[in-house]
Amino acid sequence: PEKPEGYDARAAQTLLESFPDEDIPEGEKIAVMGVMLEAFCDLTDFDALAGFDTVQEVYAPWHALEEQSLSGRLLTNIFAGGTVDTEWGFLTGASEHDEYRGATGSYVRYFTAQGYAAHYAHPGYSWFYDRERVNDYLGFERSVFTENGFGELVDPYVAMWHSDQQLADYLLADLDAADGSPLFSFAVSYQNHGPYAETESTVPYVSPEASGWSQESCNMLNNYLFGVNETVREYVRLTQELDARDTPVVLVLFGDHKPWMGNGGSVYEEMGIDFDTSTLAGFRNYYATP
């Protein structure tokens, strides 16, 4: 990338050094909880879907949550897959990564050095992306996957479409078990993982008659929105449950990438979404998540 206009490396280093590197005071070691949401994006960002009241209703609780929070858009470097690029970027601050082969600097290790417990949760298999091993390298003290916990809570196949309730409940129980001790927890959801069926759908959020799009495209959108509708409500519930507790918590929710929508992004193409990444608008459309 080109050097930004007005950038001065020496001035940047001086500015960086002006921020003190201090430990978190004992009385301020509040819980920090991060949740990366599988294939989560706000489809009302696209004009093609923003005009549907049924779609707006899906995201209305999320929009209300955004109004109460610090919110915006995360620009990832992946589309419809490659989840761990966003995951490990969040945990390390590095925009790119090589294969992890040993102990690696991370925010996880920062928190454990400050006396926090560091827990990881994902209702999927530990071998996928070699997460179990990498989590050890990143500094997590405990990682719970399908094999050692979530398999008793939700069938791993069903988890692709319905597991946010179980994950939210697990995170709350883990927080309660900490009983006020400093805790950094990070979870990767599995619900809404693609692909989304194109042959049928349960709830008709959009239809060929109202949209002019093919039945197959509408089915994929409807099946995705059906899962997202539940996701939104589960994590709004999570925030409400946290608000009801005496223990303060910093909660960070974000999506890992845009959802897969047909081979070659066929659904996006049919909706007329601009994915020209040579333009700022197209780049944001392609990579931005809440």
Residues covered by each model-derived region:
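A nucleotide-sugar donor-handling region in carbohydrate enzymes
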Residues: P4
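Solvent-exposed soluble domains appended to multi-pass membrane proteins
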Residues: D8-I30, G34-P290
